[in-house]
Amino acid sequence: MVKTVAVMVGSLRKDSLAHKLMKVLQK
């Protein structure tokens, strides 16, 4: 699941929200 999210975030890394989400998920 995390890997799928990472891929999605990578595809939408343009969005700042995605970046913030990844940070929260990593925490």
From Swiss-Prot:
The keyword Oxidoreductase applies. Its EC number is 1.16.1.7. Reductase activity that acts on Fe(3+)-chelates and uses both NADH and NADPH as electron donors. May play a role in iron uptake. Its cofactor is FAD. Induction: By Fe(3+) ion deprivation. It is an enzyme of class 1 (oxidoreductase). This is Ferric reductase B. The keyword Electron transport applies. It catalyses: 2 a Fe(II)-siderophore + NAD(+) + H(+) = 2 a Fe(III)-siderophore + NADH. GO terms for molecular function: ferric-chelate reductase (NADH) activity. Homodimer. Binds 1 FAD per subunit. Disulfide bonds: none annotated. Keywords: Electron transport, FAD, Flavoprotein, NAD, NADP, Oxidoreductase, Transport.
